[in-house]
Regions:
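N-terminal Rossmann-like or analogous alpha/beta NTP/dinucleotide-binding catalytic cores
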Residues: 2-148, 297, 301
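Short helix-capping/linker segments at secondary-structure and domain boundaries
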Residues: 113-117, 152-159, 259-267, 297
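A generic secondary-structure signal for well-formed alpha-helical elements
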Residues: 76, 83, 111-115, 155, ...
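Conserved nucleotide- and phosphate/pyrophosphate-binding catalytic cores
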Residues: 29-31, 166, 172-339
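A generic structural motif
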Residues: 23, 158-159, 213
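Classical nucleotidyltransferase
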Residues: 102-104, 118-127, 131-181, 185-203, ...
């Protein structure tokens, strides 16, 4: 650990924060606004552990693991480009810290199966990803693996979208049950609901790699325009002369994220009076998105010229994460009579 990092650690006193992202494809605007911007701010005030959740990727993409390694490298480049600092935050790959799997295994000894079956996303993802066989032990148990990810570092806070709050509540229940059996080893973390976490995709559903409706952080200006100009809008605006209502328009959500108050007011007035069409309405929003992505992409290009940068970041992150994980697992093994 560098002197600068040690000083930074000592100046941050708001508790440990843990979060991760699955390397199942290119990061997109949903990740940027729903997680990454928040992570960049959190690292200023908290000890942060951000990890590439490659084992979690296998819970749904087990039949096609070929992209995990390259997606991991791309994800680290994106993280660095948006402002995550490896001298401040611990950036690592889940599978390189085997204590995640060990703690998951030990938790599986004490957690009732119905606790996992009642997690809302268990049924929701099975419905949404019907082309995949998700009747696996790994998929059923992935919320418990999330609990292990969080509790391994004794996180105080977990930044999540509102739809992920049940996972945090499960983690709190896991901590309580373990502590009741074996003594006070784990704190109960709290969920931090991230504003702007739900970014709509081009089809109006939540932006997701799985749905093919995402604007990637690496999309150039032309690709951003092509995707967003086709984004669905208020269904009442079938013709240019039909008035609409921004509250029923998925594209307006991006105006709320990216545009100024005056720009939103002009768009709202134009939509409700049909004085502007949907294509014209989107122009200013598209330009704002392009303006935000341009410097991120430039920083990313600079990072790609630094040979071995992702490997260096992950190696240092693994070292720091492993030190904490080993300490926690020493306590766990002792509490469970495994020493």
């Amino acid at each position: 650990m560098s002197n600068n990092q040690q000083t930074s650690d000592e100046s941050r006193s708001s508790g440990i924060v843990v979060s991760g992202t699955r390397p199942t494809g290119a990061l997109h605007l949903g990740h940027l606004n729903g997680a990454l911007k928040n992570w960049v701010q959190l690292q200023k005030t908290a000890r942060c552990f951000f990890f590439v959740a490659d084992w979690h990727a296998l819970t749904t993409d087990y039949a096609e693991p070929g992209g995990i390694a390259e997606n991991t490298r791309a994800m680290i480049l994106d993280w660095l480009a948006v402002g995550l600092d490896p001298d401040v935050s611990v950036l690592f790959r889940q599978s390189q810290v085997p204590e995640h799997a060990e703690l998951h295994l030990l938790f599986s000894m004490i957690i009732p199966v119905p606790w996992l079956e009642r997690v809302p996303s268990y049924k929701e993802q099975q419905d949404q990803l019907q082309g995949r066989d998700l009747s696996t032990y790994g998929f059923l148990g992935y919320p418990l693996l999330q609990s292990a990810d969080i509790l391994l570092y004794k996180a105080a806070r977990v930044p999540v979208g509102e739809d992920q709050l049940p996972h945090v509540e499960l983690t709190r229940e896991v901590a309580r049950r373990f502590n009741r059996f074996y003594g006070p080893v784990f704190p109960e973390p709290t969920g931090m609901v991230v504003e702007a976490a739900r970014v709509p995709g081009t089809d109006g559903r939540k932006m997701s790699k799985s749905y093919g409706n995402a604007v990637a952080l690496t999309d150039d200006a032309d690709a951003v325009h092509t995707k967003l100009v086709r984004m669905v809008t208020d269904p009442r605006r079938q013709r240019r002369s039909d008035p609409g209502d921004p509250k029923d328009c998925p594209a307006f959500r991006l105006h709320e994220i990216y545009c100024t108050e005056q720009e939103r007011a002009e768009v709202t007035q134009g939509c409700r009076t049909a004085s502007i069409g949907c294509v014209d309405c989107k122009k200013v929003m598209i330009r704002r998105v392009q303006d935000e992505l341009a410097p991120i992409q430039e920083r990313r290009r600079e990072l790609t010229l630094r040979r071995g940068i992702t490997e260096e970041v992950l190696a240092e992150g693994r070292k720091q994460a492993a030190a904490v994980a080993e300490t926690t697992m020493g306590e766990v093994r002792g509490a469970m009579g495994l020493l």
